[in-house]
């Protein structure tokens, strides 16, 4: 009976040790796009605030262009003709400095509470 209690205690200890390490991995996995859309309207592209490029060679398994429109995050295929053309247009605009899409920074692990992004403040007023 005493050996069963010792075995149970060792199993409980192993579970407790394993839990914190798996929680550290979850914030990275939850920020990756798991599906991409192959179609996107030009009207929606006009409302993009931020664009990020997700590569398939890092922490994420799928290549994607992440578009931030208001409070939504849209994952679009980087092979979409409309996205490629839109990215070229954004880079060519005089008021943008370089490309509007930035590479997603990999390797930064955040604590569970620090996963939330701060809202962005824009100087232009929305008609809505």
Curated annotation (Swiss-Prot):
Biased composition (Basic residues): 94-113
Pfam families: IL8
Composition-biased stretches (Basic and acidic residues): 114-128
MF GO annotations: chemokine activity; CXCR chemokine receptor binding
First-listed, main subcellular location of the protein, grouped into a coarse class: secreted
Keywords assigned by UniProt, alphabetized: Chemotaxis, Cytokine, Disulfide bond, Secreted, Signal
Chain segments carrying region Disordered: 89-128
Full protein name: C-C motif chemokine 28
Species annotation: Canis lupus familiaris
